[in-house]
Amino acid sequence: MASLKSIKKRIVSVKNTGQITKAMKMVSAAKLRRAQENVVAARPYAAKLGEVLGRLSRNQDADSSPLMIKRTTGKALLIVVTSDRGLCGGFNANLCKAAERFVKERGAEFTDLSIMTIGRKGYEFLKNRQKIRKNFGTVFSNLNYQTAALLAQEVIQGYLDEEFDEVFIIYNAFRSVMSQDITLEQLLPVTPPEAADEEYAPEYIYEPSKSELLGELLPKHIEVQIFKSLLESVASEHGARMTAMDSASKNANEMIGKLTLQYNRARQAAITTELMEIISGAESIKG
């Protein structure tokens, strides 16, 4: 049986760990509220921009913009969005495994498939397993629209320079604190959502022309999609960490209970042993 001293030391250690996990849960809860607000604000904007692109692209040729042209040379880029920090359950590992499944299942469709990682954890997981084109490991330390725009511009330029012909992004979409959905989307070539057929749809007069507006809005669309994906990932990360730390705190409390019971039993056994020794000593003196 473990000594009283070692059991007490373990109880103190687990209590300290429990305090840390509880504090991390509270920090993640506060950050989650802000991140969730950002996601809720970004989704309608992204949806409306897609709706506008759908109207603009109606009756337009597929080659009306370089970003809509489909090429068949077979070079592709997969953007993998993870976090910079761990302690968030299977948040990063599950997404990286999904990225590897994509490479395995669809890799044969492309002559070259490279990966761009956003987030340190994704890079660390994939760097020795897949072809990494580039890693952005400090994006989340100061995430803003300008950062996403710079990422988008690099991706767009690579597409225009025909370094790759298709661009996909995989990330964790936020659903709730307990639920994050791994989501795969195609960024390039842009395929605007089809505008809904309306019996009495208004006829818009565009100034400047539709093609000019598409030329301006398509890069903006890529920027918004990447920014929204990053915001979704941040909210999902905090939700996953909050859940993981809550589970860790409960496990710590449960372990403290078991160790306390073990400590009390060991202490009781030690006291009983001492009493038996005293009684035996007294009996031997009498004898």
Curated annotation (Swiss-Prot):
Q: Which GO terms describe its cellular component?
A: plasma membrane; proton-transporting ATP synthase complex
From the Swiss-Prot or TrEMBL record, what is one GO molecular function term?
ATP binding
Q: Which UniProt keywords apply?
A: ATP synthesis, Cell inner membrane, Cell membrane, CF(1), Hydrogen ion transport, Ion transport, Membrane, Transport
Q: Which HAMAP family match?
A: ATP_synth_gamma_bact (MF_00815)
Family designation: Belongs to the ATPase gamma chain family.
This chain's function reads: Produces ATP from ADP in the presence of a proton gradient across the membrane. The gamma chain is believed to be important in regulating ATPase activity and the flow of protons through the CF(0) complex.
Name of the molecule in the record: ATP synthase gamma chain
Tell me the organism.
Geotalea daltonii (strain DSM 22248 / JCM 15807 / FRC-32)
- What lineage, starting at the top, does this entry show? Bacteria, Pseudomonadati, Thermodesulfobacteriota, Desulfuromonadia, Geobacterales
Point out the gene that encodes the protein: atpG
